[in-house]
């Protein structure tokens, strides 16, 4: 635009559609043998284990029994289900009793 006032003849519109762009990618991927090696290494790794302290009562004399176990998260949840169910822990004093 030239001048102080805007007039319609100063505005030029270019109303041609843009050139179409192909959206297909023709790029070739490189060999992924390194990725396969990483996947194998991750599969061979053992799951992460932690120490868990369990304080419960003896089913015979109601004395406190402390256990320390090392297992995975899934295994400790299974142990919790067993302890809340029918599994009972016996202290060393009550163990020899029938």
From Swiss-Prot:
Assigned GO CC terms: host cell cytoplasm; host cell nucleus
Protein name, entry field: Protein E7
Post-translational modification: Highly phosphorylated.
Motif, LXCXE motif: chain positions: 23-27
Region (E7 terminal domain): 1-42
Residue window of motif Nuclear export signal: 76-84
Zn finger region (unnamed): 58-94
HAMAP family: PPV_E7
Transcription regulation recorded as keyword: yes
Pfam families: E7
InterPro entries: Papilloma_E7 (IPR000148)
Major location (coarse): host cell
Function: Plays a role in viral genome replication by driving entry of quiescent cells into the cell cycle. Stimulation of progression from G1 to S phase allows the virus to efficiently use the cellular DNA replicating machinery to achieve viral genome replication. E7 protein has both transforming and trans-activating activities. Induces the disassembly of the E2F1 transcription factor from RB1, with subsequent transcriptional activation of E2F1-regulated S-phase genes. Interferes with host histone deacetylation mediated by HDAC1 and HDAC2, leading to transcription activation.
Phylogenetic classification of the source organism: Viruses, Monodnaviria, Shotokuvirae, Cossaviricota, Papovaviricetes
Keyword DNA-binding: yes
Subunit structure comment from the entry: Homodimer. Homooligomer. Interacts with host RB1; this interaction induces dissociation of RB1-E2F1 complex thereby disrupting RB1 activity. Interacts with host EP300; this interaction represses EP300 transcriptional activity. Interacts with protein E2; this interaction inhibits E7 oncogenic activity. Interacts with host TMEM173/STING; this interaction impairs the ability of TMEM173/STING to sense cytosolic DNA and promote the production of type I interferon (IFN-alpha and IFN-beta). Interacts with host ZUBR1.
Organism: Human papillomavirus 11
């Amino acid at each position: 635009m030239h001048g102080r006032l805007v007039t319609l003849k100063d505005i030029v519109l270019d109303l041609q559609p843009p050139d179409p762009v192909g959206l297909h990618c023709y790029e070739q991927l490189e060999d992924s043998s390194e990725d396969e090696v990483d996947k194998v290494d991750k599969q061979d790794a053992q799951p992460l284990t932690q120490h868990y302290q369990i304080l419960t009562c003896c089913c015979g004399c109601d004395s406190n029994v402390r256990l320390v176990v090392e297992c995975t998260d899934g295994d400790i949840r299974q142990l919790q289900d067993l302890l809340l169910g029918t599994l009972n822990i016996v202290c060393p004093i009550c163990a020899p009793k029938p």
